[in-house]
Amino acid sequence: MIAELGNYALALSLAVSLMLAIFPLWGAEKGNAQLMALARPMTYGLFASLSIAFAALFYLFAVNDFSVQYIVNNSNTTLPIYYRLSAVWGSHEGSLLLWIWLLAVWSFAVALLSKHLPQEAVARVLGIMGIISVGFVLFVLFTSNPFTRTFPDFPVDGKELNPMLQDVGLIFHPPLLYMGYVGFSVAFAFAIASLMTGKLDSAWARWSRPWTLAAWVFLTLGIVLGSWWAYYELGWGGWWFWDPVENSSFMPWLAGTALIHSLSVTEKRGSFKAWTVLLAILAFSLCLLGTFLVRSGILVSVHAFASDPTRGLYILAYLVVVIGGSLALYAYKGSQIRSRDNAERYSRESMLLLNNILLMTALCVVFLGTLLPLVHKQLGLGSISIGAPFFDQMFLIIMTPFALLLGIGPLVKWRRDQFSAIRTPVVICVFVMLIAGFALPYFLQDKITVSSVLGSMMTVIIALLALYELQQRATHRESFFVGVRKLSRSHWGMMLAHLGVAMTVWGIAFSQNFSVERDVRMKVGESAQIGRYDFKFTGVTDENGPNYIGGKAQIDISKDGQPEASLFAEKRFYTVSRMSMTEAAIAGGLTRDLYVALGEKLEDNSWALRLYYKPFIRWIWIGGLFMALGGLLCMFDRRYRFNVLLKK
């Protein structure tokens, strides 16, 4: 009965989304206020119907209704309740339902929080989001329905959720990532609405920017959590593998970052209009591309869902319609919104333009590096591999000038400026950067590499120029402490985000260059050394869970003879899925991680273990959190705060 309720709710949501896609847009085109007024109630109805469907799937997992095929494939009577509930989005069908429900959440938020906008603008934006919803609801109903019954079979138990996904990271990572993906549909809808009317001004940028920031914050948090999840769950000691599906989330993040900076120019100066619209289209298109890569079956990845060709063809067709249609509209109407003024050679606008060029260069590198091997293979030309060394080298080249721009850009005035105004502080900061770039790796790790020097230089120049810019802004008209308190949330957000980039670069530079890995065979009581750290293997005890059996190894770590930490690494065997999993143990800190992964028991009663020393690796994720916090502060700046907008 509940499964049928979920099906009926999906069918109702299809009908409502079709009406939302037609009537408000028709009303906006004809100037019919009554039809435009239907946009909000239809959006509320779409949200309600999809919420019922989503709640129904939650209930079916909670009670383990094995008459539903999706429950059979992803749950089991031994699976803990918190993993049962998060298994709702643990596979293809449920994750698609999560996608369209989150799309309804974003639509609901736009309808609720945009009462200050003109009725025509709201009708167009919600109508476009209705069109997007139609495509995905059709996809779920006819190719990926999570409510399909098992009849005439009646299984008494299920196959279990993939053990790799039985982790707290699964509870939060996919919803955060999807909130980011789907959130860019709002920026996309605003962009298409502006193309339809041929009007785009500073007010449009001010309406669109908080929604873009919100999507970017969620996507940043999703990527950060996914990277952390891979680090501790997969047992490889790595945090980013340039996997095609990882790249498919990174590409819209790069486009979204460029869009945020471009929107600031459109809002402040009325420039970059056509380029900003194109970036909004690109960001959401890349989100759709990522969906195609994950669900088409053309990838072999720890992230990819097994899928049949029908699903891949549907998404490809949907991709062509949405991207092709939006680009065709852009080609037809783009000239009507194009900016007529040109930025001066040395101005804040030109700095942000260079920023966008470098971000787009990075995006092209990831795009080509990800898709070229796939296209090459699909064309029958054989397999080629583009691995981490290519991406690492290219990003080192791109990030070096980007870091300098990140520091100098906020110091430059809008419209026109002279470099002589900031020459002295920039020269001093560059001088300090050159010294620190060599000194920091040498004094902290006793050796120097090219990439560690460049990484240290990038970190130092971003941080120094950000602090100098803070001092200049705060003391422009007031004393420092008075001026600091008067700075806007947007300014603090910008500074935190830029410092977050510096922290992440620092963590990457040191963890990539100075990590130490050892594969060892150890018997009880034996020790292995990494630098000044001694890892002593004290034995393995049984460690069984509700749906697995396994062993837990204790490793005592000392530094220069003094106790440092005791780690407990596990090896689990999941009895239903017949899979083995490694649960790494980590002693974390701001300056280093000590990481142990337990392998197999060997014939001579020794155990295989993998030991890691990873300096400053946590700065990668701390920097990501700073970026997200910066975006959040910008989003709630006085100009954009939703509670202020609601009062207008």
UniProtKB/Swiss-Prot annotation:
Keyword list, A-Z: Cell inner membrane, Cell membrane, Cytochrome c-type biogenesis, Membrane, Transmembrane, Transmembrane helix
Gene Ontology annotations for the cellular component aspect, listed alphabetically: plasma membrane
The family this protein is said to belong to: Belongs to the CcmF/CycK/Ccl1/NrfE/CcsA family.
Entry keyword annotation includes Transmembrane helix: yes
Subcellular localization(s) per the UniProt record: Cell inner membrane
Any single GO BP term: cytochrome complex assembly
Protein name: Cytochrome c-type biogenesis protein CcmF
Transmembrane feature ranges: 8-28, 43-63, 94-114, 122-142, 176-196, 211-231, 274-294, 312-332, 352-372, 394-414, 424-444, 448-468, 490-510, 616-636
Stated role: Required for the biogenesis of c-type cytochromes. Possible subunit of a heme lyase.
Organism: Haemophilus influenzae (strain ATCC 51907 / DSM 11121 / KW20 / Rd)
GO MF term list: heme binding; heme transmembrane transporter activity
Residue pairs linked by disulfide bridges in the UniProt entry: none
PANTHER family hit by this protein: CYTOCHROME C ASSEMBLY PROTEIN-RELATED (PTHR43653), CYTOCHROME C-TYPE BIOGENESIS PROTEIN CCMF (PTHR43653:SF1)
Lineage per the UniProt record: Bacteria, Pseudomonadati, Pseudomonadota, Gammaproteobacteria, Pasteurellales
Gene label: ccmF
Membrane topology field: Multi-pass membrane protein
Superkingdom in the source lineage: Bacteria
InterPro entries: CcmF_C (IPR032523), Cyt_c_assembly (IPR002541), Cyt_c_biogenesis (IPR003567), Cyt_c_biogenesis_CcmF (IPR003568)
